[in-house]
Swiss-Prot record:
Gene coding for it: BRMS1L
Residue ranges of coiled coil: 50-82, 147-178
Subcellular location: Nucleus
GO terms under cellular component: Sin3-type complex
Positions of region (Disordered): 1-56
Gene3D superfamilies noted in UniProt: 1.20.5.1500
Family, similarity comment: Belongs to the BRMS1 family.
Pfam assignment, any one: Sds3
GO terms of biological process kind: negative regulation of transcription by RNA polymerase II
Protein name: Breast cancer metastasis-suppressor 1-like protein
Amino acid sequence: MPVHSREKKENNHDEMEVDYGENEGSTSEEEETESSSVSEEGDSSEMDDEDCERRRMECLDEMSNLEKQFTDLKDQLYKERLSQVDAKLQEVIAGKAPEYLEPLAALQENMQIRTKVAGIYRELCLESVKNKYECEIQASRQHCESEKLLLYDTVQSELEEKIRRLEEDRHSIDITSELWNDELQSRKKRKDPFSPDKKKPVVVSGPYIVYMLQDLDILEDWTTIRKAMATLGPHRVKPEPPVKLEKHLHSARSEEGRLYYDGEWYGRGQTIYIDKKDECPTSAIITTINHDEVWFKRPDGSKSKLYISQLQKGKYSIKHNHN
């Protein structure tokens, strides 16, 4: 071991010093007496061997002592390090070690920040979902209201159309009933065929038509004709004098609940402009399209109708409102 080599070098150095001192002593003694030097040299050599052996034993003892001290120090250092590690481990287990507390504090701070951010994000998501829900509810309500208004207008227009047709039927029935009553009254007023009075012949001037049908058949035919004219349109119920047919200036017709006018199609619920000659155009919403007429609703809530023949003749014109 290095300790042994060092101790050996020290022993050799001490021996050299001893030898050097002894040599000086011997030279001085040689100068004093030459006779006594020979005897003393023999004695000094015997002392040197004993001295070396004694010093060697001392060095060995000292080396063993040093090795023992080194081993004791090493064991003591190991025990101290072990006790320090055990103490640090106990601090970590107890949660008091600085090496554990500092990262733990950083982790807790990071956890608090992320928890706060997650809470804010959750609130924003809930608010977004709530806004979407309210928007959908509002859109559904608006759609329902618009559909209700449209359905109300449609039902109202259909009911008005039915009422109009019923009124026409009532008028036609009144006419036929009057004719029927007149016929009954005329029958009651007839005289007895066995009476001597004869009916005076009717004098007719000019060409005339002789009807071979009975009065009841004529009344039935008249009622059927009136009903057929009522279904064609209100403007054809009343008999009109024959007029000269006018040439249609515009193309207008009704097909499957839609209106075709001058190359464009119009449907129920669309907003249009109605233009009449010498008048300002007005805005309206189409509510019903029949075979020969169009019902529309004005902004003030009033309803009116427009005959397709009026569009064909150019009395009225319509166009889309794109606003």
